[in-house]
Amino acid sequence: MHELPLVFFTVFTQSAVGAFILLLIGGAMGLVAPRRKAIGLFSVMCLFGLGVIVGTFHVGQPLRALNMLLRVGHSPMSNEIVLSAAFAALGGLGALGLLLNRATPLCNALVWLAAIVGVVFLYAVPQIYQLPTVATWRSSYTTAMMILTPLIGGGALAALFGVRRLGLLVSVLAILVNFCLRPGYMATLMSADSALTAAQHSWFTAQAILLAAGVVGVVVCARLKSSAAVLAMTAVVVIAAELAGRIAFYNLWTLPM
């Protein structure tokens, strides 16, 4: 599918921002050692960077991205590009500085500033898809599902990188909210375009199964204090679930972006 780069861009960047913020909160609460927090912040910034790199394949030509920058403040997509660049710069420099233990006060300020930019970025992404001509996208469910991604994927990643209890709690609560919203979301999609929605049944089913598996993984990790391998597998499973759901989402529009 032509939109596959956007699938990875949105899920990877949203999950990375969610994990980044949770790691900072966990660090402020004393839930994770500074060194481990620094490693986690740098790791999720690498994931964010990977998402951005994959996303550039959708743009096609670098000049096209530059043209988008001319509409900052007027175009949601332009806002997304600027915010992602700002988060990457602030978060990347701050996380690298903390990892290398250089200019710690400045780097701490940079990562918290990056977190603020990240929150704005998370809000800006779903605004791109509130198109009046695409009935399957223009709903509050689109915003809700995209806001849940940084909580589901980001929570699992934060748990993996040291903020175990907080990350697992956030992830499992977000998954449960996803399941609660799912009937209404499916009903809204069916009323907008039943044939197109029915064609995505396998992707939505895969997402639900993987999210359920993620809940099981969270419970196992929480109750048995499992190893990092189980935490890593849980994070992979829930992010894969979000990728499946995002593929279904982009398939709800038949015209290429």
Protein language model features and the residues they cover:
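Terminal, non-catalytic protein-protein interaction segments that mediate quaternary/complex assembly
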Residues: 1-17, 23, 51-52
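Long, contiguous internal "core" modules enriched in hydrophobic/ aromatic residues
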Residues: 3, 10-12, 31, 38, ...
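Membrane helical hairpin/interfacial module
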Residues: 19-86, 90
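Hydrophobic alpha-helical segments of integral membrane proteins
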Residues: 20-22, 55, 122, 218, ...
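Membrane-interface helix-loop junctions at the exits of transmembrane helices
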Residues: 55-59, 186-187, 245, 251
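Composition- and surface-driven signal marking solvent-exposed, interaction-prone regions
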Residues: 231-235, 253-256
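Juxtamembrane boundary at the C-terminal end of a transmembrane helix
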Residues: 240-257
